[in-house]
Amino acid sequence: MTPEDQEETQPLLRPPGGSAPRGRRVFLAAFAAALGPLSFGFALGYSSPAIPSLRRAAPPAPHLDEDAASWFGAIVTLGAAAGGVLGGWLLDRAGRKLSLVLCALPFVAGFAVITAAQNLWMLLGGRLLTGLACGIASLVAPVYISEIAYPEVRGLLGSCVQLMVVTGILLAYLAGWVLEWRWLAVLGCVPPSFMLLLMCFMPETPRFLLSQHKHQEAMAAMQFLWGYAQGWEEPPLGAQHQDFHVAQLRRPGVYKPFIIGISLMAFQQLSGVNAVMFYAETIFEEAKFKDSSLASVVVGVIQVLFTATAALIMDRAGRRLLLTLSGVVMVFSTSAFGTYFKLTEGGPSNSSHVDLPALVSMEAADTNVGLAWLAVGSMCLFIAGFAVGWGPIPWLLMSEIFPLHVKGVATGVCVLTNWFMAFLVTKEFSSLMEVLRPYGAFWLASAFCIFGVLFTLACVPETKGKTLEQITAHFEGR
């Protein structure tokens, strides 16, 4: 066995006597890091209340037309894709802690530019900056938290990444009821500012420090996080932290988690989650909710409640079980969604443009209201199922399955895949509905959910209760 193999497969962080650490400061450090995902969620949710506010804005404030509003929402995903690449580069060179500190800067700068915006280009520039920060935070925060957490709480703390994302989205929706777009952007500066402040007092992850052979700093970090540092092993002296090389993809400990990580990110976006979110307000309108903006808040509350539930049971139920159950729920709910659109579809049209409100707004009011409640139930079931499994777990597994020496590149590729697929699905879903009709598009999403369940059962290992080094050893076949 080579020194590199020893480093990747033996526990770097082994407590004396095999006992589990019980330090409480690890929760403080995880909270500080999770303020990045909270900022990320707020940036994602910002566009929903801000776009109507900008459309109402009187000169000289910038005004959004339909095309500009589309870009105002979508440009975040492009910035985040770039942020994923940059975050992967920073992760191994600047370290986990400094990467989180640095990602706070484009968050604050982006919201500050939006606050001061006098034209469309400033708005888009600010959104691009916040998107860049979203990409970095979505990569670095899960890795930081997974590397400071001991196995007994890694699922709980790792799931808090997605919990903070959906909490940030919900906060943006709620604040949007009382704040105009400029003040909403000011509020967006608060979470990353707190993260910047708190992370200055948090340690670098012990695993990263040990991989750099900074023994004393690693011992100090362990003492801070877990309360003691005696008896923990340093990697063999011959094991040096190495950059990623393409030849390493021949190793099963590298290519297997690569395939799993990329596939999970792709299946997450192909599940139809963005389409369901996009049409939430239309569905609530058809169910006769007078204030359709209530849809956003209801969706946000469901996400928060069920993501919190997932966090609490993650280390007992396990990743595979929750992914499988989540996928099954999503299969049935997207199938029901497609059935709703099939039953409410209007007659033949000469127009090639799919106008969803027209498709679901026919004259048979009583019948349609009943069917709309079917859609509302299906939508809520889908969101609950997604929040329990396919929402948080791909991000959690991404932070667990890669060995240290490829983690920066590998997680960067996974995040890039996720954001690129999000952009592609969001932009092309309307075109897909023109070809397949809305019911066909959602039935296709249901098929992808089935493939996701089968992939989970066939390829995804259980990681609960294992050290990160034991997970790597599993992929290496040792």
Curated annotation (Swiss-Prot):
Chain ranges passing through the membrane: 26-46, 71-91, 98-118, 128-148, 159-179, 183-203, 258-278, 294-314, 321-341, 369-389, 406-426, 440-460
SUPFAM superfamilies: MFS general substrate transporter
Segments for region (Disordered): 1-20
Entry GO MF terms: D-glucose transmembrane transporter activity; dehydroascorbic acid transmembrane transporter activity; fructose transmembrane transporter activity
Glycosylated residues in this chain: 350
Xref: InterPro entries: MFS_dom, MFS_sugar_transport-like, MFS_trans_sf, MFS_Trehalose_Transporter, Sugar/inositol_transpt, Sugar_transporter_CS
Family: Belongs to the major facilitator superfamily. Sugar transporter (TC 2.A.1.1) family. Glucose transporter subfamily.
NCBIfam families: SP
Protein's recorded name: Solute carrier family 2, facilitated glucose transporter member 8
Organism listed in the record: Bos taurus (Bovine)
Designated gene of the protein: SLC2A8
